Swiss-Prot record:
Residue ranges, compositional bias (Basic and acidic residues): 454-465
Presence of keyword Cytoplasm: yes
UniProt keyword annotation of Transmembrane present: no
Organism taxonomic ancestry: Eukaryota, Metazoa, Chordata, Craniata, Vertebrata
GO terms under biological process: negative regulation of cell motility; negative regulation of Rho protein signal transduction
Domain of life: Eukaryota
Keywords linked to the UniProt accession: Coiled coil, Cytoplasm
Compartments (UniProt record): Cytoplasm
Coiled coil: 69-208, 260-295
Full protein name: Coiled-coil domain-containing protein 125
A GO cellular component entry from the record: cytoplasm
Chain spans, region Disordered: 65-84, 432-465
Amino acid sequence: MGARSRRNHGHLPQMKTRGRFLDFLSHSRPIKEGGERSNGPFSWTSCRAMYSVFREELEAERVARWEKRQSESSTEDTSEELQRRLQEVTEEVELLRTELEVTHRHLEGKHEALRILQGQAILDKATCHTKMLLQKSEERTKALEKEVNALQWEITFNQVQFKNVENSWSLKYERVLAENEALKKGLEEKMKEHQKQRTENASLSQKCLELLSMLSAKERRDFQRTQPSCSLRTDGSALELAVYGACQCNSNGGEPCSCARSAAASRKQVLQLKQELEQQQKRKDEAYVMMDAFRIAFEQQLRRVGENVLRQAETDRHQTHNQRHEKGKQWSLTVGERLKKILPTTSDGRIPSDSSETLHMLLDLLNDKEEALAHQRKVSYMLARNTENLEKRLLMQLEELDVSHEESKTKTVASEDYEWSRDCRCCADSCGSQHLSVPDDKQTYKANQPPSENRPETKPDNKDA
């Protein structure tokens, strides 16, 4: 009984140490029932810490046992007790071995659980990342689908617009082509009409030059003065074109019609009226110049007389009666001495002694001088106008002489061309006849020449010029 009680008493500290070790393990990692994980945080316990705790507990138990053995050795220290203790020690060693194996297995299970948890955590992270990537990719695909749909709609809309624009431009192009063809036809017709009018104008200008060459210099000058102003752009005014279109006379005989005669008479009347108007304008300008000269002289005379009167009134206001009398005498004496050579003498050869008479004489002389100067100014203006008119006339005469020379040259060239064409025709007729004959040069030349009566004079009239 005593041995069993000792064994039981010896097992008590062992059970206590095992219970403390299990409590330590439970505190290090609490495990739920059914093998489920706890929601609390996982705390890692190293093998060294567990071994140090286990070793401390064994040392404490050994110290307690050694004390007990010393206390018991004093009472009973026999061989049986030693055997019993040896057996207990061996049992304890086996028990410790089993506990170590259990702890090793428990640690291996913990390591496996850790590996599983780490794998699950990695899988959770990977799954979260993949879920986020999938969500982002889905959002991107949705946005891209929206953009693609919008772009497809824009493409279809632009294609429809391009088709409409292409159709409108094709219609415009066809219309412009039709208009261009119509304009080309109209332009060709206008060009033909313009060519005809140019040929007619050239023939008319040639006839006009021939007629001008037959006129004298005075008649030519009158004609050029009354000639209507025409330019290359506008060949005449609307009124002239209406008059030309109203004339329906047939001048087949080469004689001028009544419309042409009336037009020439009206041009002569216009020339006469222009000359009269120019003369009236010249007279008007001369009258204006004379009026301005007399007006300026009269204004200057009035201004000077007024200034003299004002000066005399101011001097009379500031002087007394005696001073006036004395200064009047002195002034009359000085003026008489100074103006002896200037003032005109009387029939007796004496100068008037009265100061008022001398003043009036001086004013009369001054007025005469001013009138003479105004007359000279007017005459100078008139002479300048006359010189300008003479210069203009001289330039016009020189221009007329140049024009007459040019007309004579053109007339000679035209006569030579006419003779050459006539000779060519005669040669063609002679070659085409059956009997070939070579005429004399002098005879053919005399025959081809126009008569002297019908030939216009090429030399200008020097007397008229």
